[in-house]
Amino acid sequence: MSDPLFIFYEEPDPDRWFPGDRFPRRVIRRLLRGRPQPGGVMRWFLNLQTGLELAGIPHRVNDYRGLRRTPGAPAHVVGKPHVVTAIPPGHPIIYGPGVAAHPLENDFWGRADLRLILLSCEWFRAMYARDLPVKIPTAVWPAGVDTREWCPPAALPADREILVYDKIRWQRDRLVPELLNPVMAAVAKSGAKVHHLRYGSYREEDYRQLLQRVGAMVFLCEHETQGFAYLQALACGVPVLAWDRGGFWQDPSMYPDRVKFAPVTSVPYFDERCGRKFADTAAFHGIWPQFLSELNSGRYRPRDYVTSHFDLAGQARAYVELCRTALA
Protein backbone atom coordinates (compact mmCIF):
# COMPACT_ATOMS: atom_id res chain seq x y z
CA MET A 1 0.00 0.00 0.00
CA SER A 2 2.43 2.65 -1.21
CA ASP A 3 -0.43 4.86 -2.42
CA PRO A 4 -2.05 7.07 0.21
CA LEU A 5 -4.73 5.47 2.35
CA PHE A 6 -8.12 7.10 2.10
CA ILE A 7 -9.23 7.34 5.74
CA PHE A 8 -12.78 8.38 6.63
CA TYR A 9 -14.21 9.44 9.96
CA GLU A 10 -17.22 11.65 10.68
CA GLU A 11 -19.60 12.19 13.57
CA PRO A 12 -23.30 12.26 12.63
CA ASP A 13 -24.40 15.89 12.38
CA PRO A 14 -27.59 16.10 10.31
CA ASP A 15 -29.56 19.24 9.59
CA ARG A 16 -32.21 19.77 12.23
CA TRP A 17 -34.54 22.67 11.38
CA PHE A 18 -33.63 23.75 7.83
CA PRO A 19 -31.16 22.68 5.09
CA GLY A 20 -27.59 23.58 6.01
CA ASP A 21 -28.33 24.53 9.63
CA ARG A 22 -25.74 22.04 10.86
CA PHE A 23 -22.96 24.50 9.92
CA PRO A 24 -24.01 27.45 12.12
CA ARG A 25 -25.04 25.02 14.87
CA ARG A 26 -21.51 23.59 14.77
CA VAL A 27 -20.00 27.07 15.24
CA ILE A 28 -22.40 27.92 18.07
CA ARG A 29 -21.63 24.63 19.85
CA ARG A 30 -17.92 25.37 19.64
CA LEU A 31 -18.41 28.86 21.09
CA LEU A 32 -20.62 27.65 23.95
CA ARG A 33 -18.93 24.36 24.83
CA GLY A 34 -15.38 24.79 23.60
CA ARG A 35 -13.45 22.23 21.65
CA PRO A 36 -15.30 18.89 21.45
CA GLN A 37 -13.84 16.18 23.66
CA PRO A 38 -12.93 12.95 21.88
CA GLY A 39 -15.01 9.91 22.66
CA GLY A 40 -13.91 6.37 22.01
CA VAL A 41 -14.66 6.35 18.28
CA MET A 42 -12.93 9.67 17.69
CA ARG A 43 -9.99 8.44 19.75
CA TRP A 44 -9.65 5.40 17.47
CA PHE A 45 -9.45 7.74 14.50
CA LEU A 46 -7.07 10.25 16.11
CA ASN A 47 -4.69 7.58 17.38
CA LEU A 48 -4.69 5.77 14.04
CA GLN A 49 -3.95 9.03 12.27
CA THR A 50 -1.11 9.85 14.68
CA GLY A 51 0.28 6.33 14.31
CA LEU A 52 0.22 6.57 10.51
CA GLU A 53 2.10 9.87 10.71
CA LEU A 54 4.71 8.42 13.07
CA ALA A 55 5.12 5.37 10.82
CA GLY A 56 5.49 7.54 7.72
CA ILE A 57 2.46 5.99 6.02
CA PRO A 58 0.81 8.47 3.61
CA HIS A 59 -2.91 8.98 4.05
CA ARG A 60 -5.73 11.39 3.29
CA VAL A 61 -8.64 12.16 5.57
CA ASN A 62 -12.24 12.44 4.30
CA ASP A 63 -11.02 13.02 0.74
CA TYR A 64 -14.14 11.89 -1.11
CA ARG A 65 -13.09 13.72 -4.26
CA GLY A 66 -9.69 12.05 -4.29
CA LEU A 67 -11.32 8.67 -3.73
CA ARG A 68 -13.64 9.17 -6.71
CA ARG A 69 -10.65 10.12 -8.86
CA THR A 70 -8.83 6.91 -7.92
CA PRO A 71 -10.77 4.01 -9.47
CA GLY A 72 -11.01 0.96 -7.24
CA ALA A 73 -9.13 2.54 -4.33
CA PRO A 74 -10.22 1.11 -0.97
CA ALA A 75 -11.99 3.32 1.56
CA HIS A 76 -10.90 2.91 5.17
CA VAL A 77 -13.97 3.86 7.19
CA VAL A 78 -12.89 4.12 10.81
CA GLY A 79 -16.38 5.34 11.76
CA LYS A 80 -19.12 6.07 12.23
CA PRO A 81 -21.59 3.73 10.54
CA HIS A 82 -23.34 6.41 8.45
CA VAL A 83 -20.06 7.00 6.58
CA VAL A 84 -20.28 3.52 5.05
CA THR A 85 -23.27 4.58 2.96
CA ALA A 86 -21.46 7.74 1.81
CA ILE A 87 -18.68 5.80 0.08
CA PRO A 88 -19.28 5.80 -3.70
CA PRO A 89 -19.78 2.47 -5.49
CA GLY A 90 -16.73 0.76 -6.90
CA HIS A 91 -14.58 1.17 -3.81
CA PRO A 92 -14.05 -1.75 -1.40
CA ILE A 93 -14.46 -0.79 2.24
CA ILE A 94 -12.45 -1.65 5.33
CA TYR A 95 -14.79 -0.81 8.19
CA GLY A 96 -14.01 -0.26 11.86
CA PRO A 97 -13.31 -0.19 14.68
CA GLY A 98 -15.89 2.61 15.08
CA VAL A 99 -18.82 0.34 14.32
CA ALA A 100 -22.31 0.25 15.81
CA ALA A 101 -22.77 -1.54 19.12
CA HIS A 102 -24.39 -4.47 17.29
CA PRO A 103 -24.96 -5.45 13.62
CA LEU A 104 -28.73 -5.14 14.11
CA GLU A 105 -28.33 -1.36 14.30
CA ASN A 106 -27.40 -1.13 10.59
CA ASP A 107 -29.10 -2.21 7.38
CA PHE A 108 -26.31 -1.81 4.82
CA TRP A 109 -25.06 -5.40 5.15
CA GLY A 110 -25.04 -7.08 1.74
CA ARG A 111 -25.15 -3.75 -0.13
CA ALA A 112 -21.86 -2.10 0.81
CA ASP A 113 -18.69 -3.75 -0.51
CA LEU A 114 -17.28 -4.57 2.93
CA ARG A 115 -14.07 -6.60 2.72
CA LEU A 116 -13.15 -6.59 6.41
CA ILE A 117 -14.68 -5.43 9.69
CA LEU A 118 -12.19 -4.46 12.37
CA LEU A 119 -13.31 -4.84 15.98
CA SER A 120 -11.26 -3.58 18.88
CA CYS A 121 -11.26 -6.70 21.06
CA GLU A 122 -11.93 -10.41 20.80
CA TRP A 123 -15.29 -10.61 22.59
CA PHE A 124 -16.68 -7.83 20.38
CA ARG A 125 -15.33 -9.52 17.25
CA ALA A 126 -16.91 -12.82 18.30
CA MET A 127 -20.31 -11.18 18.80
CA TYR A 128 -20.14 -9.48 15.41
CA ALA A 129 -18.96 -12.63 13.65
CA ARG A 130 -21.84 -14.58 15.18
CA ASP A 131 -24.59 -12.04 14.49
CA LEU A 132 -23.70 -10.50 11.12
CA PRO A 133 -26.59 -11.22 8.71
CA VAL A 134 -24.11 -11.86 5.87
CA LYS A 135 -20.67 -13.43 5.97
CA ILE A 136 -17.95 -10.75 6.18
CA PRO A 137 -14.41 -11.37 7.47
CA THR A 138 -13.68 -9.89 10.90
CA ALA A 139 -10.42 -9.21 12.73
CA VAL A 140 -9.26 -7.66 15.99
CA TRP A 141 -7.49 -4.31 15.84
CA PRO A 142 -7.12 -1.98 18.85
CA ALA A 143 -5.66 1.49 18.37
CA GLY A 144 -2.39 2.48 19.97
CA VAL A 145 -2.09 4.75 23.00
CA ASP A 146 -0.06 7.96 22.94
CA THR A 147 2.42 7.22 25.71
CA ARG A 148 4.17 10.53 25.06
CA GLU A 149 1.12 12.43 26.33
CA TRP A 150 0.00 9.81 28.85
CA CYS A 151 3.06 9.28 31.02
CA PRO A 152 3.91 9.02 34.75
CA PRO A 153 4.77 12.10 36.81
CA ALA A 154 8.40 12.98 37.36
CA ALA A 155 7.97 12.20 41.06
CA LEU A 156 5.50 9.86 42.74
CA PRO A 157 2.64 11.56 44.63
CA ALA A 158 3.49 12.17 48.28
CA ASP A 159 -0.02 11.56 49.56
CA ARG A 160 -2.22 8.57 48.91
CA GLU A 161 -4.98 9.55 46.49
CA ILE A 162 -7.29 7.14 44.70
CA LEU A 163 -9.43 7.80 41.65
CA VAL A 164 -12.79 6.07 41.26
CA TYR A 165 -13.63 6.17 37.56
CA ASP A 166 -17.38 5.83 37.13
CA LYS A 167 -18.54 4.55 33.75
CA ILE A 168 -21.59 2.71 35.03
CA ARG A 169 -23.89 2.98 32.03
CA TRP A 170 -27.10 1.26 33.03
CA GLN A 171 -29.19 0.49 36.11
CA ARG A 172 -27.56 3.34 38.01
CA ASP A 173 -30.50 3.47 40.40
CA ARG A 174 -29.38 0.03 41.60
CA LEU A 175 -25.62 0.05 40.97
CA VAL A 176 -24.84 3.41 42.55
CA PRO A 177 -26.05 2.34 46.03
CA GLU A 178 -24.96 -1.30 45.62
CA LEU A 179 -21.54 -0.77 44.02
CA LEU A 180 -20.32 2.80 43.61
CA ASN A 181 -21.19 4.09 47.08
CA PRO A 182 -19.67 1.10 48.96
CA VAL A 183 -16.51 1.38 46.86
CA MET A 184 -16.21 5.09 47.59
CA ALA A 185 -16.80 4.49 51.30
CA ALA A 186 -14.21 1.70 51.50
CA VAL A 187 -11.58 3.81 49.75
CA ALA A 188 -12.24 6.74 52.07
CA LYS A 189 -12.16 4.47 55.12
CA SER A 190 -8.68 3.30 54.15
CA GLY A 191 -7.44 6.86 54.66
CA ALA A 192 -7.01 7.76 51.01
CA LYS A 193 -8.28 10.94 49.44
CA VAL A 194 -10.99 9.90 46.98
CA HIS A 195 -11.57 11.46 43.58
CA HIS A 196 -14.77 10.53 41.74
CA LEU A 197 -14.81 11.05 37.99
CA ARG A 198 -17.83 10.21 35.89
CA TYR A 199 -17.42 9.32 32.23
CA GLY A 200 -18.44 12.11 29.88
CA SER A 201 -18.21 14.87 32.49
CA TYR A 202 -14.57 15.93 32.16
CA ARG A 203 -11.98 17.26 29.74
CA GLU A 204 -9.12 15.01 28.70
CA GLU A 205 -6.51 17.45 29.99
CA ASP A 206 -8.13 17.51 33.44
CA TYR A 207 -8.12 13.71 33.50
CA ARG A 208 -4.46 13.62 32.50
CA GLN A 209 -3.55 16.03 35.28
CA LEU A 210 -5.53 14.02 37.82
CA LEU A 211 -3.66 10.86 36.85
CA GLN A 212 -0.43 12.62 37.86
CA ARG A 213 -1.74 12.85 41.43
CA VAL A 214 -3.27 9.45 42.13
CA GLY A 215 -1.62 6.21 43.13
CA ALA A 216 -4.32 3.87 41.82
CA MET A 217 -7.67 3.81 40.07
CA VAL A 218 -10.84 1.81 40.66
CA PHE A 219 -12.51 1.32 37.28
CA LEU A 220 -16.27 0.73 37.21
CA CYS A 221 -17.78 -0.20 33.86
CA GLU A 222 -20.06 -3.04 32.71
CA HIS A 223 -17.98 -3.82 29.63
CA GLU A 224 -15.46 -2.24 27.27
CA THR A 225 -14.41 -2.90 23.69
CA GLN A 226 -11.00 -1.25 24.18
CA GLY A 227 -11.17 1.03 27.21
CA PHE A 228 -9.07 4.09 26.45
CA ALA A 229 -9.64 5.63 29.88
CA TYR A 230 -8.17 2.74 31.84
CA LEU A 231 -5.38 2.23 29.26
CA GLN A 232 -4.47 5.91 29.61
CA ALA A 233 -4.30 5.42 33.38
CA LEU A 234 -2.04 2.39 32.93
CA ALA A 235 0.19 4.41 30.59
CA CYS A 236 0.56 6.98 33.39
CA GLY A 237 1.81 4.24 35.69
CA VAL A 238 -1.47 4.03 37.64
CA PRO A 239 -2.46 0.47 38.66
CA VAL A 240 -6.13 -0.35 38.14
CA LEU A 241 -8.58 -2.33 40.24
CA ALA A 242 -11.30 -3.17 37.73
CA TRP A 243 -14.88 -4.26 38.20
CA ASP A 244 -15.16 -7.14 35.74
CA ARG A 245 -18.50 -8.84 36.24
CA GLY A 246 -18.36 -10.82 32.97
CA GLY A 247 -21.55 -12.53 31.91
CA PHE A 248 -23.84 -11.20 29.21
CA TRP A 249 -23.54 -8.08 27.12
CA GLN A 250 -26.37 -6.13 28.73
CA ASP A 251 -27.08 -3.15 26.50
CA PRO A 252 -30.76 -2.58 27.40
CA SER A 253 -31.62 -1.68 23.79
CA MET A 254 -30.74 -5.26 22.81
CA TYR A 255 -30.62 -7.48 25.90
CA PRO A 256 -32.34 -9.80 26.67
CA ASP A 257 -35.07 -9.73 24.02
CA ARG A 258 -33.01 -9.26 20.85
CA VAL A 259 -29.44 -10.30 21.66
CA LYS A 260 -27.82 -12.58 24.21
CA PHE A 261 -24.05 -12.80 24.05
CA ALA A 262 -21.47 -13.84 26.63
CA PRO A 263 -18.87 -13.51 27.98
CA VAL A 264 -17.87 -9.87 27.93
CA THR A 265 -15.23 -8.03 29.94
CA SER A 266 -14.60 -4.51 31.17
CA VAL A 267 -10.84 -4.82 30.68
CA PRO A 268 -10.16 -6.61 27.38
CA TYR A 269 -6.47 -5.71 27.59
CA PHE A 270 -5.07 -6.51 31.02
CA ASP A 271 -2.54 -8.75 32.74
CA GLU A 272 -0.90 -9.10 36.15
CA ARG A 273 1.24 -6.01 35.53
CA CYS A 274 -1.86 -3.81 35.32
CA GLY A 275 -3.62 -4.48 38.63
CA ARG A 276 -6.43 -6.72 39.80
CA LYS A 277 -10.09 -7.43 39.03
CA PHE A 278 -13.20 -8.10 41.10
CA ALA A 279 -16.64 -9.40 40.14
CA ASP A 280 -18.95 -7.71 42.67
CA THR A 281 -19.06 -5.58 45.80
CA ALA A 282 -18.29 -8.48 48.13
CA ALA A 283 -15.24 -9.39 46.06
CA PHE A 284 -14.10 -5.76 46.13
CA HIS A 285 -14.14 -5.68 49.92
CA GLY A 286 -12.08 -8.86 49.95
CA ILE A 287 -9.41 -7.68 47.53
CA TRP A 288 -9.17 -3.96 48.34
CA PRO A 289 -6.82 -4.28 51.37
CA GLN A 290 -4.52 -6.60 49.43
CA PHE A 291 -4.48 -4.30 46.41
CA LEU A 292 -3.61 -1.34 48.65
CA SER A 293 -0.75 -3.20 50.29
CA GLU A 294 0.67 -4.15 46.91
CA LEU A 295 0.74 -0.64 45.46
CA ASN A 296 4.17 0.19 46.84
CA SER A 297 5.66 -3.28 46.45
CA GLY A 298 6.68 -2.96 42.82
CA ARG A 299 4.30 -5.76 41.87
CA TYR A 300 2.52 -3.66 39.27
CA ARG A 301 4.15 -2.27 36.14
CA PRO A 302 1.17 -0.92 34.22
CA ARG A 303 3.06 1.33 31.84
CA ASP A 304 5.21 -1.60 30.69
CA TYR A 305 2.05 -3.38 29.59
CA VAL A 306 0.86 -0.43 27.49
CA THR A 307 4.22 0.31 25.89
CA SER A 308 4.63 -3.34 24.88
CA HIS A 309 1.16 -3.68 23.32
CA PHE A 310 -0.08 -0.27 22.19
CA ASP A 311 2.70 1.53 20.35
CA LEU A 312 1.05 4.08 18.04
CA ALA A 313 3.21 3.43 14.99
CA GLY A 314 3.19 -0.32 15.60
CA GLN A 315 -0.59 -0.45 15.72
CA ALA A 316 -0.83 1.70 12.59
CA ARG A 317 1.42 -0.74 10.76
CA ALA A 318 -0.71 -3.62 12.06
CA TYR A 319 -3.78 -1.85 10.68
CA VAL A 320 -2.18 -1.51 7.25
CA GLU A 321 -1.15 -5.16 7.23
CA LEU A 322 -4.66 -6.35 8.11
CA CYS A 323 -6.06 -4.20 5.31
CA ARG A 324 -3.45 -5.43 2.85
CA THR A 325 -4.31 -9.06 3.59
CA ALA A 326 -8.05 -8.46 3.28
CA LEU A 327 -7.69 -6.70 -0.06
CA ALA A 328 -5.24 -9.16 -1.59
What are the language-model segments listed below?
Residues 1-81, 317-322, 327-328:
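N-terminal pre-catalytic "stem/leader" segment of glycosyltransferase-like enzymes
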Residues 35, 127, 146-204:
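Conserved catalytic-core segment of nucleotide-activated headgroup transferases in glycan assembly
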Residues 40-43, 277-324:
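A charged, aromatic-enriched C-terminal amphipathic alpha-helix characteristic of glycosyltransferases
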Residues 43-127:
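Extended catalytic core of nucleotide-activated donor transferases of GT-like folds
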Residues 115-126, 134-150:
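Donor nucleotide-sugar binding/catalytic pocket of nucleotide-sugar-dependent glycosyltransferases
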Residues 212-214, 232-238, 243:
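Conserved donor-binding/catalytic loop of nucleotide-activated donor transferases
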Residues 222:
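Aromatic "clamp/platform" in nucleotide-sugar-dependent glycosyltransferases that forms part
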